[in-house]
């Protein structure tokens, strides 16, 4: 049996998730830059099942758009089945089966939308194990030191599975069992359909439990097998924010380790957070306190951090980014950024450029080799190559109603405290004096100076601040001790 021709996957995402205590649907809470449901759908899409169904119920009007987005992103159809009333997992699976063609006769894989670390290898192993035998159902199990909240696996003395008992219905003796149901199964569809029609809700939660299918199949003298997963994190579900945080740490450690094995030096894995879609080139060094988020792309031989957060930022080979907060920006090869630099969306720094201490940029293009060393705001601007912007300069882009653009050419040198009142253009090779307020265009090669001649008013301190410390110091410097 092959997964691509014989399997359908049903993902259960209909529950209310009340223990999350959140306005956000549980399956949309994120780990490593992806929602839990996105993690699961990414995984199940990789096994190339013939049909993929998401069962939605509570908050489906908010979850359905995410399913549609993922369907487009993954390039495959994801059917949506609706569970209008939350009557239990058995009822949810029955709703999911209604989305399959009536003549589908293959294997049905069932998983939950809140098992974010489930991987392709584990699912493939389940499908292979189930397809190679005569079992009507195969259950993924794992062993937990604290199984509280999970259904327990009931076995005979010969270790055959005879049932699954939910926590609420378990006896004290059964609650000591540490082998648990993960909520991931493979079924033959005919046996599954038959068993679902016989589910009863006479249990502690008055629901139709999918787990009761195991006992029904055993009563039908059908074989039920278990496939044990040693790495319990792969099949651990999330019910509250503590579990979300715990699994997030596990996933982050695995992401960090994968980058390390691929040739990235990460000084302190415990303080470094890297989202699942981030790419990092070989021989890059990541220092403590760094977060690389979203679709960030970092080249080879870079230095990132410490204390740096980059979200959807592309960093070229050999760049250095220190104590910087950046989003939706591009940093060119060999460029230097930081410390204490703020890159807002739309920043594009060219190769070998520099953005130094306490520089903020937004919606700007800064050319190759251009330097903005310190204490400057650059917004809505285009700067050419190999220019230098003096300290404490401001690109004055907003008049209270409209934002305008500033254009600065190549090989320009601007003095400290230059104000660029947009819209304004500074031509190639031009200079500005310190303290200049530019309201008019500057021709190529010109020097722009807006400040008037300096006036020194002799004796002003003696007249206006007589007897002050300044007056005494001035008199002493002038040799007037009177």
UniProtKB/Swiss-Prot annotation:
Q: What is its EC number?
A: 2.7.7.23, 2.3.1.157
Residue ranges for the region (Pyrophosphorylase) are 1-241
Name the Gene Ontology biological process terms. Answer: cell morphogenesis; cell wall organization; lipid A biosynthetic process; peptidoglycan biosynthetic process; regulation of cell shape; UDP-N-acetylglucosamine biosynthetic process
Q: Where is this region: N-acetyltransferase?
A: 263-482
Q: How is the cofactor bound?
A: Binds 1 Mg(2+) ion per subunit.
Entry superkingdom? Bacteria
Q: Which GO terms describe its cellular component?
A: cytoplasm; membrane
Q: Name one Pfam family in it.
A: NTP_transf_3
Q: Which SUPFAM superfamilies match?
A: Nucleotide-diphospho-sugar transferases (SSF53448), Trimeric LpxA-like enzymes (SSF51161)
Task: Cite the binding residues for acetyl-CoA.
Answer: 391, 397-398, 416, 434
- Which HAMAP family did the record assign? GlmU
Q: How does the record describe its quaternary structure?
A: Homotrimer.
Family (UniProt): In the N-terminal section; belongs to the N-acetylglucosamine-1-phosphate uridyltransferase family. In the C-terminal section; belongs to the transferase hexapeptide repeat family.
Q: What is this protein's record name?
A: Bifunctional protein GlmU
